Amino acid sequence: MSQNIVYSLTALMALLPASIYPYHRIAGQGADGRSAYFWGALVLGFAGPAAWALTQVAGRWHTGLSTALWITIAACMLLFMAMSALTRSAWRLSPLLLPYLLTVGAFATLAQQAPAPVVRGGAPGIWIDLHIAVSVITYALLTMAAVASLAAFLQERALKSKRPTPLTRFLPPVTESERMQLHLLGASEAVLGAGLATGMAVLYYETGALLRADHKTLLSVASFVVIGGLLLAHARTGVRGRMAARLVLIAYLLLTLAYPGVKFVTDVLLG
């Protein structure tokens, strides 16, 4: 077993306590369930992936699928910790978010042996670093928006069927989920717009062109349009519920195909 696999498995195990926390009987203890165990599990779940991701990119950026996924997991954990500290209901998204991140971590571990090319290009390093940082933040924000949207969908369905489950009793109320979804989508749209702008700047430095009609660009623009359309529709007609959830998940799927999806094809299938 290679050293990298061992490190990746260690980062994966660091996510396990946080992933099982919502399903453990102690989840109802402490301040609204946010006990010392909860915060300790979140810190561990952030520290493991973050340390491993920083080790892989130390000195220079690698564009491999596994590295990108670990960076994304660390960013999502950090954002979730901040939201849990600043709001009353965000921590209740943990039954949906944390097992999902554990699954992504398992996939990152399986992809550890895939090629991890180093970023090269003619653009100044600051522009490349800025573009990568903005892309990671965008994906983390939209991940949280998709989770909040899924929570609202599950709650709405349980209310209509009058059959709540232990999961829906744990999740935030519909209004809280939709409020978080809207705020996260607004932030995602702003940061994604900045990401498209920095991407154009990097491409201009490298090729002299502002746009390139590749899969990543087209899917990113499509995500920007879908999110913008949803925000506009919400402002004008108050669209919400299942329709809003579907549009958010479509935007998340498009952005997933644009970032991890393209890396999966180039690094794993074609690598």
From Swiss-Prot:
One of its GO terms (molecular function) is heme binding. It comes from Azospirillum brasilense. The lineage of its organism: Bacteria, Pseudomonadati, Pseudomonadota, Alphaproteobacteria, Rhodospirillales. GO terms for biological process: cytochrome complex assembly. InterPro entries: Cyt_c_assembly, YpjD/HemX. This is Uncharacterized 28.8 kDa protein in nifR3-like 5'region. GO terms for cellular component: plasma membrane.
